[in-house]
């Protein structure tokens, strides 16, 4: 071979060698150094299945699971993988149209990027889930993911336990992107307050897909998987049997019941009427059910136990007595000559049910007979107390006592949206009366009226203070967090603090008030609250109620108020009952409270109580004006729907559709008031369009 040919051969070999080295180096770079293409390949072959954790279980005081978990399925979409897709078949299977399909896919890509799985449809109904599983290979980019949902086995405690729902973009932003699209979080009740405890930690499972988009097995034996961590449980003071009794007796009623263990502040039961089944806010129909509850003018979503503001009425009188005793204004033997009405302010009000002076000859009798004149006078003595220099200073001192009893401030219960109630300060009266007012101006504060407002929780807590002779623990549900951490301890410590707000008041003074409250049950207005062989201390109340309807303030039936604790010598339960528009407190509040106290203290109820229980569970005491208000709100909503859609199906029941489509022109008569024709709209429409389920408690 010539020298020239040998050189050319070497050059060609060298070129091949260099080219081979370059190719090997590039392959090494692509496959080892850079993970870009391996990631693309993996994304096409492997589905990262999100594993949602089970939320923590909530237990009652006896260890019964009152909030548990069940499994449903979410349909997830990864928009970037939706290719070669039979959209029409998919839409037919999912019972949606193509416009809805395109909208959901676009929203998923926008909110969570095109390469991340996002919820396409949450909580599939079982039949739809089965149809999808049979055809999943036809729909690349879609997959089913298990979703633990909440299950309420006792159908009770809806407002207290709360509910969960999918996080919103605002929730994600507030969390610093801790949450992702598709995550659920507590939205109300204990679910919201203890979210960090209950939520757990999501996991990821990598699953291989075949060329037909079917999930066929774990990728690399699961070495890249992350296990989901279940949430931790809560042990509560709630007695679910007591809770069920309370809710059944509040069926078809508006009001609330709160029962507390005085020695711990643990809430034994809390019911708010109208009641509803908490399972309505879980599962595939939850949004429809939520809308129904929101549009109910009776406000079932409003937890009246902590958000309802009521005049305490005569249930306030034991508190007023303790203020007067501690200020040295009276002794237990102090009497007042009442002849049926209070005349010291010259107006003969408030009236009293008794007209013989002996019924208020001392404090014990005044409490037992609920003398309005006696307690009105005690308030005026406190407000006009000379040692404070004037009515404004005396009033503010009186108000400080009420704040110590827990009125007019948030107690700090472990539920969201607690109302503080209302005890007006002097600025309210200065503004209303232009600085010219006296203790006669607001004298009915002494009997729990005027501008005073308290929640049922505050009233029950005030009974705890009397039962404990001066102290209380912040009312709360949770007794223990499973696997308690330092952060949990910091959260729980505020419920372990003993608030000695009125322990300086002597036992003798507390005993005088408690004796009077016992007499209320023995021979007074709370005789129907008596429990054999148990000393019960109680006070009834009846508070006036008004509402605004059709632009007018109308008088409704009175609210029935009731407070109690038992046993007198070793109190184990304190209770407050409010039944709106039910009338006398002893007739409705007393028996409801007795049945609950009897059940808790004896673990059963007598035949007499059982018979009464049947009556209270089947009697409808829903305020009559709510039916009128619901009709009004629904007619306004139907009118708005017709104006937006021209769909008359919702409005026919309220008015003649012909008059809406073609309003008749009314002939005007000279000299007469020619009012416009109202079409499916009642007066003061704007008030109820803004807050359709709101009505005023006064």
How would you label these PLM feature ranges?
Residues 1-287, 309, 331-334, 394-402, ...:
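Periplasmic/cell-envelope proteins involved in peptidoglycan metabolism and beta-lactam response
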Residues 488-496, 612-622:
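Intrinsically disordered, low-complexity charged/polar segments
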